[in-house]
A protein has these predicted regions:
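Short active-site neighborhood of thiol/selenol oxidoreductases, capturing the structured segment around
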Residues: 1-7
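Hydrophobic beta-strand core positions in alpha/beta domains
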Residues: 3, 23, 34, 56-57
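Structural microenvironment flanking redox-active thiols in thiol-disulfide oxidoreductases
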Residues: 22, 35-45
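A short glycine-leucine-enriched loop at secondary-structure breakpoints
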Residues: 46-50
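The canonical Cys-X-X-Cys-His
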Residues: 9-12, 55
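Hydrophobic/aromatic anchor residues within beta-strands of the central parallel beta-sheet
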Residues: 30-32
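Non-catalytic, surface beta->alpha helical segment in thiol-disulfide oxidoreductase systems
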Residues: 51, 56-86
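Typically the conserved alpha-helix immediately C-terminal to a functionally engaged Cys/Sec
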Residues: 11-27
């Protein structure tokens, strides 16, 4: 999972704590990569990251396309996406 965030973004801060819960529950079965959109502006533009926070879910099955969400998601919803969509 890739978390596109900004330090000044309130919902991004809230999402970070939810992602910590997900990581604590799922452990090594999930990887979370954080990308600060201010520090990585070129990458964010290339990937058309417009709303924050944006999560991009990438599974191990390369046949399935990545799933993108924008906005705050509770930990339970993130876990549901991981278990049902990836």
């Amino acid at each position: 999972m890739i978390d596109f965030f900004a330090t000044w973004c309130g919902p991004c801060v809230l999402l970070a704590s939810e992602l910590e819960k997900v990581k604590a529950e799922l452990g090594e079965s999930v990887r979370i990569v954080k990308v600060d959109t201010d520090e990585e502006a070129t990458l964010s533009t290339q990937l058309q990251i417009q709303g924050l926070p944006t999560l991009v879910f990438v599974g191990t099955d390369m046949e399935k396309p990545a799933l993108r969400t924008e906005g705050m998601l509770p930990a339970e919803m993130v876990k549901n996406i991981i278990s049902n969509e990836l």
